[in-house]
Amino acid sequence: MKPLTRPATLSAQVYQAVADEIVSGRLKAGMHLRQEEVADRLGVSRQPVQQAMVMLSLDGLVIKSEKRGLYVAPFDPELMQKHYDIRSALDGLAARQAAQRLSFDTFLVSRIEKLGEGILAKGRAAISQSNIVAQITCDEAFHHLIYDVADNPLLATSARIHWQYLRRAMGEVLRHVESPQNIWQQHEAILSAVVKGNSATAEKLALDHTSSASKRLFEAYKDIGLPNEKVVGKR
């Protein structure tokens, strides 16, 4: 890890640094998180680390135990499915409302299309570089673009907690699937439907996209066995 700067936002930076390590798999389920070591690696005091650990605990990425202290939360596919179910509903609604808006606000169409294509290009570049964290960041950016176009601020707010948790699920999937390009083909199809103002198609594609993501997660879990509660209990 690189030393962090900008003291006013240190706790948020520590949060993101640790979350990225969990998402990337560098910090695995059950691994202890000693605040002194995290602070030393990041070049910060313990206070922002403590604050970050509270946020990580609230988002389900870290668990605090009286006996074990702080450790990376186990991978829970059933809980992941619940998060995917809610995100699916939000993403379907967002795609439909975004397409409806662009169907009568043609001034925005070319701008949104350009922004979307830029994110698609970055996502595909991240695949070619085998950069999982960057792939997830671009994936999240794409969906937040759709939230923004839908012009419903409650969508992004409601989706935030699910995205924080599902970033980890996405990391697990991307480490174990052979064709992440399919994800970006689906994004491209959603974008196309949105900019064409085809609300029914956009909604269906968004729902199918989240459903396939959930399916990939469970296939990876079944095929190779991702870390779970039992694994953690044996450590």
Language model: regions and residue ranges:
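Short linear motifs at protein or domain termini
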Residues: 1-104, 218-235
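Long, hydrophobic, amphipathic alpha-helical segments used as structural scaffolds
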Residues: 98-102, 150-158, 170-177, 217, ...
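Conserved amphipathic alpha-helical segments that form helical-bundle/coiled-coil interaction surfaces
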Residues: 78, 83, 105-171, 185-189, ...
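A short secondary-structure junction motif
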Residues: 21, 25, 122, 162-169, ...
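C-terminal regulatory/effector modules of DNA-binding transcriptional regulators
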Residues: 41, 174-235
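Hydrophobic residues in alpha-helical segments
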Residues: 22, 98, 102, 123-127, ...
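Short helix-capping and inter-helix turn/linker motifs at the boundaries of alpha-helical repeat units
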Residues: 9, 114, 133, 178-181
